[in-house]
Amino acid sequence: MTEANVTAAQSGTGSVPENWKPHIVALVCNWCSYAGADMAGTTRLEYPANVRMVRFPCTGRMSPLMILRAFEQGADGVLVSGCHPGDCHYVQGNLVARRRFTIFRSLMDFIGIDLKRLHFAWVSAAEGHKWAKVVSEVTASVQEAGPLPSFDHPEGWDGIDLPEMAGSGPQELDEDQLNAIRDNLRKAASEVLTGGRAGSVIGYGPGSLANQTIPLFITEAADCEKLEWGQGCRNNLSTYVGSALDKHERVAVVAKTCDLGAISGLIREGQLRREQLVVIGVQCPGVRDGPGLATKCLSCSGDPHPICDLVVTVDGVRESCEDPSAAALDTPDARDEQIAYLETLPHDERWKYWQRQFGRCLRCYACRAACPLCYCSTCITDKHRPQWVPTSIDHPGNSTWNIIRAVHLAGRCSGCDECARVCPADIRLDLINRKLSLEVERQYGKIGLDPEKKSALVDFRMEDSEEFIL
C-alpha cells in the first residue's frame, strides 16, 4: 500500500486523499481470463495498472472467503473473472460459481459493501481487448467508490433502530392442553421404544431452571415419563441425531415445526438416511425467548408437517399428518420488514451497523456448535495452513468469520435461529440468514422440506441470471 492508501484505510471518514489510487485484486481463471490478460499484454494494449492478479484453475475453485480476505487485507475492489458459460475446461465450474457469486454479491450489498467495489466478468483467452476494457471500467468504478471503509468499531455512532416485529404466532395452548400433549408424547415415545421402531428417543427433559429444558436421550420406555413439552423446549434436537446414530441403528427425534427443515437438510446432504429416523412431530405453542415469543415463532403456525412419522397433538397420536395449508406455509416472516428497512439505508450506514454487530463477536463459536448444518469435521476457522480466518477477536477477522459462515449456509439454512439464540453477544445472525434465504428463493425458487430436491447452490441452469456479469 502507498502512504495515501494507508491513510485512507485508517481514516474511515469517507474523504479521498489527493494521491489515492485504488488497489484492486483480480481472481482469474487460468485457462481463459489469465490468458486473455496475457494477450492484452503481448498486444501492448494499455489499461490501468491498479489490478493485481491471482490465478486459479477455475472460477469454481474461487471461494467467497478469498474475496473477503482481499477486502480484509486492504483491497479497495475485487474482480472475479473466468470462462464464458459453456467454455469451462472443467465443464460446469463457472456455472456453479455463477450461482454462488450471485448470492454472495447480494449479501455484500446487504452488509454495506458498495457493489462498485465488486465485479464479475467473462473473459476468454482470445479477448485481450475485453480484458483491457473490463479493467478500465472496474478501476473507474472503484475509484468512484473511494477507499474501502474501515473495519473498526464505529465509535460515537448511535446505531439504527429497527422496526418492531409483529406476528400472531402459533395457536395459544393453555396448561391443560400442554399437559395433554406432554402425556401423548410420552405415550408415543414409549410405544416407539417398546415396539422396536428405534433404539433411542431424543426429546426434552427438565432443566435446572424454571421454564428451561435440556436435550434428553432415552433408551428405556420407563424413562419416557421424564419427557417434557412446552415453551421452554428451545433446542433444535436434530443437532444430536448424528451422534445418537453412532450407537443405535434407528433413532426417534422429537421435532418442532422449525426443526424439520434441518432434518430435511441433513437427509438431502447425505448426513442422515430417512430410514434411520422416526420423526415425532409435536403441535408447538411457540418457544419463549425472554418475556415473549421467539422471533421465528411470530410467523409460524406450529403445525407438524407430512415429513413426520408420528404426530402428537392435544387430541392424541396419529401415524401421519395432513399437509398444512398453503397460507400457513407462505406466511411472511416477521424479520422481512427489518431486512427491507436496512436495505433502504445508505451503504455506509449499513456497513456501520454490521461492523458494530460483528465487533461484539467473542469468537466462542456457539453459533457453529448449535447449528445442525455446521457438521464439517474441521471448520475453515480451525484450519491454519494457511490461516484463512484470523482467530483473534478483531474486527476484520470477526467480519470474515460471520460472513463466511452465513455464505456456507446460503440455500441450506432451515431458519431454526439456533445460532442467534445461543449467541452471547446477541448478534443479529438471523437477519443475515433470512436475507440469504430470501435471495435464494427469489433467484432459484423454494425447495421447502423435500429432502429429494437439491440445494440451490449445488445446482445450476444454463439460463441462470447473470445481468451483473461484465
What annotation goes with each model-predicted range?
Residues 108-110, 335-359, 373-470:
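Ferredoxin-type iron-sulfur electron-transfer modules in oxidoreductases and energy-metabolism complexes
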Residues 23, 294-297, 358-364, 368, ...:
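Residues immediately within or flanking Cys/His clusters that coordinate Zn2+
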Residues 261, 369, 430:
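Glycine-centered loop/turn positions within well-structured domains
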Residues 1-354, 358, 372:
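Iron-sulfur-associated redox domains of electron-transfer enzymes in respiratory
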